[in-house]
């Protein structure tokens, strides 16, 4: 049980630090902002991982692409597990995105804004528990542990 408590405390501390302001003055509530990062990811796919397999499958809901701050604004928070899929040039998931709308998404790939002139080298997926507005390597570890042990809750 101590392992779970330490994991929960680590996530709470990490997520608390992610809730700060970016200095903007937009006070209107325009929806739920989902942020994906390991460095901010620009043009990463955000989707609902409805079958919890850690992959963006063709039948799963495509919610949108992240911006240069790693953010995507949604009208409402989805109820299922959120996930973020990076895209590499000519990769399988890039082709899956292009199949949705070739005109709109041709040539789209993910960039880690820590290295903005480079495309991502590998397709990766990070997941987050349904209550989280942040998708990161830490939230992915939490989602994995929760999937392994149904007794672990988000609280």
Residue ranges of model-derived segments:
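C-terminal motif of bacterial Sec signal peptides marking the signal peptidase cleavage site
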Residues: 15-17
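Feature for extracytoplasmic/surface-facing segments of secreted or surface-associated proteins
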Residues: 21-155
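Sec-dependent signal peptide recognition
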Residues: 2-9
């Amino acid at each position: 049980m101590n392992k779970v408590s330490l994991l929960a405390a680590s996530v709470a501390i990490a997520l608390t630090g992610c809730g700060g302001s970016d200095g903007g003055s937009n006070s209107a509530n325009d929806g739920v902002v989902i942020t994906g990062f390991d460095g901010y990811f620009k043009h990463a796919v955000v989707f609902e991982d409805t079958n919890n397999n850690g992959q963006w499958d063709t039948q799963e809901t495509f919610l949108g692409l992240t911006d240069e701050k790693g953010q995507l604004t949604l009208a409402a928070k989805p109820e299922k597990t959120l996930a973020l899929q990076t895209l590499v040039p000519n990769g399988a998931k890039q082709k899956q995105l292009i199949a949705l709308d070739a005109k709109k998404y041709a040539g789209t790939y993910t960039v880690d804004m820590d290295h903005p002139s480079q495309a991502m080298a590998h397709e990766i997926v990070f997941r987050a528990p349904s209550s989280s507005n942040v998708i990161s390597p830490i939230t992915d570890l939490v989602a994995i542990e929760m999937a392994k042990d149904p007794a672990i809750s988000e609280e």
